[in-house]
Amino acid sequence: MTTILKHLPINQRVGIAFSGGLDTSAALLWMQKKGAIPYAYTANLGQPDEEDYDAIPRKAMEYGAEKARLIDCRKQLVAEGIAAIQCGAFHNTTAGVTYFNTTPLGRAVTGTMLVAAMKEDGVNIWGDGSTYKGNDIERFYRYGLLTNAELKIYKPWLDTDFIDELGGRHEMSEFMIQSGFDYKMSTEKAYSTDSNMLGATHEAKDLEFLNSSVKIVNPIMGVKFWDENVVVKAEEVSVRFERGYPVALNGVVFDDSVELMMEANRIGGRHGLGMSDQIENRIIEAKSRGIYEAPGMALLHIAYERLLTGIHNEDTIEQYHANGRVLGRLLYQGRWFDPQALMLRDSAQRWVASEITGEVTLELRRGNDYSILNTVSENLTYQPERLTMEKGDSVFSPDDRIGQLTMRNLDITDTRKKLFSYATTGLLSASAEVGLPQVDNNNLTARGLQDKSK
C-alpha cells in the first residue's frame, strides 16, 4: 500500500508543518479551500531569525486551520545536538573545518515531535514544505513513519493540481491577496536560509555558483568576520564538561541546557566561529553546496575534542573518529534513530563521553581562528613527566627503549623482504642512487635497496 498521496485528500484531516511563510500559508489556505481539513503544527526550534512564535499559530487559524499548535522542541534539539558532539557525528569537513549537521539534527526532532503531536490529534496525514530534489523529503518521510506507522504523506509540492495553480511565489502571493489577505512577499535574498538554535544553513540561488563566496551572506548567528571594518576583539572563554555534558561557560553553571546553548551561540557568534563552506553529497548522490553557521556547536566541539585527546588513548580516539564519520552520514540521511546509529551512539556515549570531565580555556579571535590556552581535567592521561627531556625520575630507562627498538627488528626484516619481493615481480625497481621507495612515472620505485638478508 502506498504511503504517498499524489492528490489532496478531501474531507480528511491533513497536518502541515507550518512556518508562517508564504509557501506554507498559501498551501494551508489552498487545502482548506479545496475541501481538506488542515491542522497546523509549528516547531519552536529556537530559530535565531524568528521573532514571535506565538503569532504563527494565530496566522494558521486565520488561513483556515481547524487547529494550530506550537510545539516546543528546543530541549530535545539541544539534547540531540549534545549527543552529536559526544559522538563526533560529523562527516562533512573541508580542510579541518566542520559542518555540524545542524539541519539533519533539526529534522530528526521536528519529524518525530510534530508527527507525535499530530497522532495525539487523530491526524494521520502529514505534509511539509520539502521539495523532491532535496534531503528533507526523505528525512521527514523516515522520521514520520517511524513515529506513526499509519501515517500517509501528502505534500502540496508533489501535487500537480497545486503546482498548476500555485507553482511560484508570485502566484502564491496573488492567491493570498485575492483571498482577502494582504500578504506581501518578503524581499528576495540572493540565497535561502533555514535555521534552528544549533545552526543556520544558507544555500541555493546565487550560492549554487562556486564563484559566489561567503562574502554575500549576512550571518544571522554571528558577524562578518571577513570584513575588516567589523570590529572583533579577542576573547578568553572557558568551557566545562562533566561526564560528557557541557555544564558551564566562563565559570557560570547552567542548569538549563537550552540556556547554555544560547549563551554558547552568543559567545561564538561574536567571532563568527563555526562558519563553514561545504560541497557535500546529498542523499540522492548529487552534490550541493552550503554555507553554514554553528557558533555554539563549534565552541562546545572544540572543548570536547581537546579533552578527548588528553583523556583517551590513541585506539579509542581513532575509533571515535571512524564511528563518528559513519554516524554523521547516518544522521545526514535521516537515520539518527535507526538501530545501527543507536549502536554507535550508545558505545560513544557510554565508553567515551562518560570520561570527558574537565575545563578548556580558549582565546577566540576572528572566524575559526582560536588558540587553546589551558586544559584541566582530573581524568587526563597526559602526564608530561613521562616524556620530560629534563633529568629526573623516568617511567622507563634508555635500556628499556633499546629493548623496545630491538623488538621492531622483526617487522622491519619482514618489510624489507616484502620490498625485495615486489622488486622481483617488477612492482618496484632498484637503484643505488636513492635509498627510499618513491613514485616515478606513476610507478613506485625502490632505489638503492640492498638485500642484507642474502
Curated annotation (Swiss-Prot):
Residues noted as binding L-citrulline in the record, renumbered to the chain: 99, 135, 139, 192, 201, 203, 280
Catalytic activity: L-citrulline + L-aspartate + ATP = 2-(N(omega)-L-arginino)succinate + AMP + diphosphate + H(+)
Known pathway: Amino-acid biosynthesis; L-arginine biosynthesis; L-arginine from L-ornithine and carbamoyl phosphate: step 2/3
Bilayer-crossing regions: none
Keywords tagged on the record: Amino-acid biosynthesis, Arginine biosynthesis, ATP-binding, Cytoplasm, Ligase, Nucleotide-binding
UniProt EC number: 6.3.4.5
Residues annotated as binding L-aspartate: 131, 135-136
A Pfam family the protein falls into: Arginosuc_synth
Gene3D superfamilies per record: 1.10.287.400, Argininosuccinate synthetase, chain A, domain 2, HUPs
Enzyme class: ligase
The UniProt record lists the keyword Amino-acid biosynthesis: yes
Binding locations of ATP: 17-25, 43, 129, 131, 136, 194
InterPro entries for this protein: Arg_succ_synth_type2_subfam, Arginosuc_syn_C, Arginosuc_syn_N, Arginosuc_synth, Arginosuc_synth_CS, Arginosuc_synth_type_1_subfam, AS_cat/multimer_dom_body, AS_multimer_C_tail
CDD domains, per the entry: ASS (cd01999)
Location(s), subcellular: Cytoplasm
GO process annotations (BP): argininosuccinate metabolic process; L-arginine biosynthetic process; urea cycle
One Gene Ontology molecular-function label: ATP binding
Family according to the record: Belongs to the argininosuccinate synthase family. Type 2 subfamily.
HAMAP family on file: Arg_succ_synth_type2
NCBIfam families tied to this protein: argG, PRK05370.1
Subunit composition and interactions: Homotetramer.
Record PANTHER family: ARGININOSUCCINATE SYNTHASE
Record protein name field: Argininosuccinate synthase
